[in-house]
C-alpha cells in the first residue's frame, strides 16, 4: 500500500485518503460478539471512514455543533472511559473531525485523579460506555454542571446503512491540536514522530529500519494493550494508518483482568491469522507461556514477539528464539513517544542499536559503565514534555543502557535508574535483573529484591501455587524449595550484595506481591504490606534498626543515626 501524502497526514484526512484510494483494504479485524469463539469480521477503510462520520454526527448531535468560525481553534476536551473496544479509535478520529480532542483516562485512576484531569483539561462534559458510567460519579459529585453521556455500542457506528459524509478539509500545517493539557499528542507530533518515521523506515536500508515499523508492516497483531494507554491507541490507530498493521480487536467482555496464559492461548486458537502475524506481550506473560508445551505451540504461530513494560530475562528470550520466533523490545514513554530502536538481529535479541542523530536522542554517562537515554529539545519541539515545560532543555528517560563489548554502536538494556539497589557499602546492583533470574524458576510466581541503604539486601518471594504457603507449608520449608533459584541469582552478585536465607521473606496467603496493569511489580505498595515482616527478618538476623524505610526512604533524624552495623 502506498504512503499517505504529507498533506493528508492529519489522522481523519489519512483515513479519508485510504477510504478513497484503497477502500477495500482491511484496516482492522473486529469481534462479532462477546466471545473469541464467536468469530471476527474485517473492517475496511471504507467502512472505517463511514463509522467515523457516523460518530462525528452523533457527537455534534449530543454536544452541539461547533460554529465554523470557532472550529479548530480551542479544541474542547471530551473525556471518555469505556469498555476496551473500537470506540476508542473512532472517538479519536470523530473528535478531531468535529473540532474537539478526545482524552482517555485509565479506568483504575482514583476519583481524585479523575477530578484533577477534568479540572486541568477544563472539560464541560464526560463520555462513557454503559458499563463505565458509574466511574464518573465520584469525580463529578461536586460538579453538577458536568454531565455524563453514554456512548452507544460499536455497532451503532459500524454498520451497512448509508451515512452522510462529514466534511473535513483540514490539511497538514505547522500548528498543533491546541494548548497541551494533561498529555496532548499534537498533529505535528504525529506527523514527525510517527508518519515521517514510518516512511523513513520503509525506504531505509535493511540495517537502518525502525523495529516497530519494520515488524508491524503488513502484520496482524492482537490488540492486548488497554486502549486508554498511549501505547494501546498508538498500536490500534496511528501505526496501522502509517505502517499498514492490521490490529485484531478482542471482545472486551472476554478479556480477563489481568489477561491469563489460557486467554493468550485462546487468541492463538480463535483469532484470524494473516500472511504475517505478531504479538506484543509483557515479559511476565511470556515467562508463563514458554514453560508449557501448549504455550510454546501457541506462540509459534507468530513471526515475531515484542515485549513491553519491562526487560525480558535471557532464559525466556532465548527459549523464544529457539522456537524460531523473532524477539524484539518495544520501548517508549507517553511524554515523548516510542524510542526509535532499530530492528535487531534475530539471533542478537538482547542488544540494540539507535539511529544516528534522530530526534536529538543521546546516551549520557550514568555510572559504572551505564548510560541513560536522553533527548534534547529541538527547535519548535512538538513533544509533550517540551511543549508543556518551556524551561526544559533535556528529557532524561531514566532508561539505562550498557555498551556491548566489541560491538560498537550496540547497547544492552540495563533497566531503569530506579531499578538499582544501593547498599550502605555503596555497592550497587540491578534488582530487576536478579528478580528475573529467580522468577525463571517454576517454584517462584513473583519476587522483589530491595535493601537501599542497608548492609544487606533482602528478597520477598511469592511462591508458585503448590509450593507454599498456600498448603500450610512452613516458611522455612518454602525457602528451601525456592533457594536454588536464589542461589543461581547470587552468582551474578558481588559477595557483599548476595541474598541470604535469613533475609528471604515469604508472602502470606491472600497477600500476593501487587502487580500493575502491565504485570510489573508495584514495589512500594508491596513492600508496605510486608514492612513489619521484613523488618522482623532484619532484627532476627542481628541487624540494628536503621533510619530508612525498607524501600530506602530516610526517616527520623538521619544525621544522628548510629548506623546499621551488625
Report residues per predicted region:
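Conserved AMP-binding/adenylate-forming
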Residues: 38-44, 58-109, 223-227
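Conserved AMP-binding/adenylation subdomain of ANL enzymes
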Residues: 194-220, 224-277
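Conserved C-terminal "lid"/linker of ANL adenylate-forming enzymes
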Residues: 421, 446-448, 455, 483-563
Amino acid at each position: 500500500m502506498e504512503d499517505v501524502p504529507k498533506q493528508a497526514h492529519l489522522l481523519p484526512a489519512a483515513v479519508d485518503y485510504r477510504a478513497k484510494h484503497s477502500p477495500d483494504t482491511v484496516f482492522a479485524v473486529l469481534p462479532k460478539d462477546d466471545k473469541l469463539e464467536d468469530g471476527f469480521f474485517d473492517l475496511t477503510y471504507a467502512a472505517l471512514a463511514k463509522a467515523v462520520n457516523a460518530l462525528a454526527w452523533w457527537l455534534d448531535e449530543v454536544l452541539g455543533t461547533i460554529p465554523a468560525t470557532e472550529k479548530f481553534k480551542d479544541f474542547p476536551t471530551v473525556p471518555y472511559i469505556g469498555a476496551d473496544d473500537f470506540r476508542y479509535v473512532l472517538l479519536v478520529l470523530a473528535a478531531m473531525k468535529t473540532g474537539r480532542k478526545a482524552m482517555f483516562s485509565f479506568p483504575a485512576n482514583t476519583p481524585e485523579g479523575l477530578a484533577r484531569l477534568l479540572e486541568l483539561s477544563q472539560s464541560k462534559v464526560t463520555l462513557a460506555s454503559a458499563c463505565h458510567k458509574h466511574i464518573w460519579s465520584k469525580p463529578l459529585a461536586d460538579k453538577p454542571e458536568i454531565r455524563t453521556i453514554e456512548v452507544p455500542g460499536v455497532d451503532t457506528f459500524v454498520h451497512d446503512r448509508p451515512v452522510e459524509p462529514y466534511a473535513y478539509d483540514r490539511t497538514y500545517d505547522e500548528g498543533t491540536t491546541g494548548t497541551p493539557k494533561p498529555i496532548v499528542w499534537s498533529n505535528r507530533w504525529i506527523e514527525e514522530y510517527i508518519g515521517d518515521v514510518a516512511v523513513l523506515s520503509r525506504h531505509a536500508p535493511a540495517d537502518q529500519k525502525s523495529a516497530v515499523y519494520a515488524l508491524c508492516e503488513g502484520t496482524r497483531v492482537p490488540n492486548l494493550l488497554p486502549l486508554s494507554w498511549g501505547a494501546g491507541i498508538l498500536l490500534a490507530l496511528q501505526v496501522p494508518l502509517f505502517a499498514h498493521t492490521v490490529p485484531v480487536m478482542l471482545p472486551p467482555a472476554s478479556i480477563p483482568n489481568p489477561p491469563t496464559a489460557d486467554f493468550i492461548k485462546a487468541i492463538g486458537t480463535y483469532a484470524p491469522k494473516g500472511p504475517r502475524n505478531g504479538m506484543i506481550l509483557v515479559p511476565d506473560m511470556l515467562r508463563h507461556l514458554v514453560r508449557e508445551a501448549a504455550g510454546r505451540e501457541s506462540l509459534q504461530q507468530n513471526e515475531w514477539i515484542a515485549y513491553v513494560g519491562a526487560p525480558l530475562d535471557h532464559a525466556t528470550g532465548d527459549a523464544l528464539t529457539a522456537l524460531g520466533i523473532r524477539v524484539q523490545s518495544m520501548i517508549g514513554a507517553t511524554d515523548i513517544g516510542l524510542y526509535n530502536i532499530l530492528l535487531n538481529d534475530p539471533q542478537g535479541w538482547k542488544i540494540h542499536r539507535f539511529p544516528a542523530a534522530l530526534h536529538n536522542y543521546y546516551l549520557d554517562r550514568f555510572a559504572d559503565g551505564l548510560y541513560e537515554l536522553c533527548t534534547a529539545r529541538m527547535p519548535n519541539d512538538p513533544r509533550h514534555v517540551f511543549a508543556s515545560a518551556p524551561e526544559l532543555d533535556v528529557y532524561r528517560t531514566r532508561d539505562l543502557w550498557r555498551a556491548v563489548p566489541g560491538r560498537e554502536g550496540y547497547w544492552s538494556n540495563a533497566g531503569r535508574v530506579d531499578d538499582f539497589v544501593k547498599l550502605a557499602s555503596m555497592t550497587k546492583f540491578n534488582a530487576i535483573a536478579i528478580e528475573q533470574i529467580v522468577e525463571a524458576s517454576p517454584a517462584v510466581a513473583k519476587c522483589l529484591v530491595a535493601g537501599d541503604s542497608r548492609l544487606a539486601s533482602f528478597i520477598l518471594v511469592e511462591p508458585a501455587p503448590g509450593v507454599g504457603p498456600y498448603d500450610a507449608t512452613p516458611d522455612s520449608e518454602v525457602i528451601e524449595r525456592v533457594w536454588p533459584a536464589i542461589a543461581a541469582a547470587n552468582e551474578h552478585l558481588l559477595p557483599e550484595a548476595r541474598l541470604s536465607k535469613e533475609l528471604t521473606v515469604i508472602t502470606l496467603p491472600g497477600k500476593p506481591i501487587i502487580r500493575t496493569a502491565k504485570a510489573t511489580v508495584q514495589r512500594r505498595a508491596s513492600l508496605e504490606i510486608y514492612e513489619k515482616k521484613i523488618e522482623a527478618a532484619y532484627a532476627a538476623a542481628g541487624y540494628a534498626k536503621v533510619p530508612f524505610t525498607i524501600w530506602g526512604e530516610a526517616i527520623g533524624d538521619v544525621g544522628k543515626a548510629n548506623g546499621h552495623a551488625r
